Amino acid sequence: MAYVLTETAAGYALLKASDKKIYKSSSLIEDLNTVEKVTEQFKIHRFEKFSSAANALEEANAIIEGRISDNLKKMLEDVKNDKKATLIVSEAKLGNAINKLGLNFSVVSDAASLDLHRAIKEFLPELLPGLDDSALKQMSLGLAHSMGRHKLKFSADKVDTMIVQAIALLDDLDKELNTYAMRCKEWYGWHFPELAKMITDSVAYARIILTMGIRSNAADTDLSEILPEEAEEQVKSAAEVSMGTEITDIDLENIKALAEQIVDFAAYREQLSNYLSSRMKAIAPNLTALVGELVGARLIAHSGSLTSLAKAPASTIQILGAEKALFRALKTKHDTPKYGLLYHASLVGQASGKNKGKIARVLAAKAAVALRYDSLAEDRDDSGDFGLSVRTKVESRLSALEGRDLRTTAKVIREQPKVDITEARAYNADADAPMADADSDDESETEEEPKKEKKDKKEKKDKKEKKDKKDKKRKREEDDEEEEEDSKKSKKEKKEKKEKKDKKEKKDKKEKKKEKK
């Protein structure tokens, strides 16, 4: 008898086929295109209902992984009693798992069985009593959502989309701040041109405008909160002899409005930078410890997500961000770039020009390991100790290349007990005793003996190596001589064969001439 195992969102259905060889007949399977034919061919033998949505999720995951659950095993015990029974399943992995149970029936899972399952699932509500189409759809939708959540294992702390958006906004803010600061300096420069030369910081420049207003107020304005004492005196003295033109109150209001925008943008940028730093430490702590928050965030944003970056090899991470230069180099057959976004990492910046490529390669290899630890490790440590330990290795490599100590990271020691500082014991000189001369002689002899033994061993080893070299050389010479002799013989034989052939040809020609005459 043929049985068909069908998995539904409601439970396991075991259908009994009226034709025991239906899975062998392609014409019969093709005819299963109406409700009447399907219900005529298959009857429900047993239906094992899932107890809850959680149970349905467990059973579905077991089937995907090719495992046999207790419910399914219990259900298959009924078929075991039917001798010469055939069980048709849709999944080959599931079929192999059922075969391992050692039940008294054969399991079939091939292309024809897939067509059979497709026909059954199309008219499944008609085959299962007590289940209508809408209820089955609702169960399927709920199970699909549960499986989706189970596979994704969603966690708000691990959403790398926040990093991608934050670093993009940070770059936009930097551009806006630079543009606004340039406009502000050009605008206020007509009134107080000397201020831009003395104050290079854009935020401090904007705060001075908001506090002081026109330059004539400089003498009565307290700028100690913004500038150090020396810089404050320079600004006040420059304001008295400034060559700038006068501006109206309306001009000053508009300049102050722009200065307020600069100060607000700078404050928001700082807050966004802190937010990005905290998100990077939560999502990729080891990458952050290795390359820094900004470089790490740019790498994640460039690849799209932390997972896709973790799956990339070290060679890809090394040149990430230099794609244009790479393809240009490949097209023109020039040298490919040695680094991309990693160029801005502090470790690469510390290296000299000739060593930047080497350090970028080492850093990319370590970053690939740190990324996989952050993204794919089951039981990971969010403290970033692994990243710090890897960074020390890169720093030691950099120090070796540069020829000077460039290590800045303290060595990471895990789970070490606190150090108890105790007073060191003083040296007791009274406990010293003079040693006899005989003892010293014995000690010198015992020290000389191992040295002599080492020397003898080294001499023996050197002699053996020399002998081996001589033997190899002699053997090589003999082989060369044999090869020369063989080549001479082969040449001689070829020459003799050629001469014989020429003589024979001449003889044949003479005989032909005689015959013609």
From Swiss-Prot:
Residues 423-517 are annotated as: Disordered. Keywords: Coiled coil, Nucleus, Ribonucleoprotein, Ribosome biogenesis, rRNA processing. Residues 283-403 form the Nop domain. SMART domains: NOSIC. The keyword Coiled coil applies. Residues 438-448 have a biased composition (Acidic residues). Residues 456-517 form a coiled coil. Residues 454-475, 489-517 have a biased composition (Basic residues). InterPro entries: Nop56/Nop58, NOP58/56_N, Nop_C, Nop_dom, Nop_dom_sf, NOSIC. The keyword Iron does not apply. GO terms for cellular component: box C/D methylation guide snoRNP complex; nucleolus; small-subunit processome. One of its GO terms (biological process) is snoRNA guided rRNA 2'-O-methylation. It is found in: Nucleus, Nucleolus. It holds the Pfam family Nop. Disulfide bonds: none annotated. One of its GO terms (molecular function) is snRNA binding. Required for pre-18S rRNA processing. May bind microtubules. Belongs to the NOP5/NOP56 family. This is Nucleolar protein 58. It comes from Debaryomyces hansenii (strain ATCC 36239 / CBS 767 / BCRC 21394 / JCM 1990 / NBRC 0083 / IGC 2968) (Yeast).
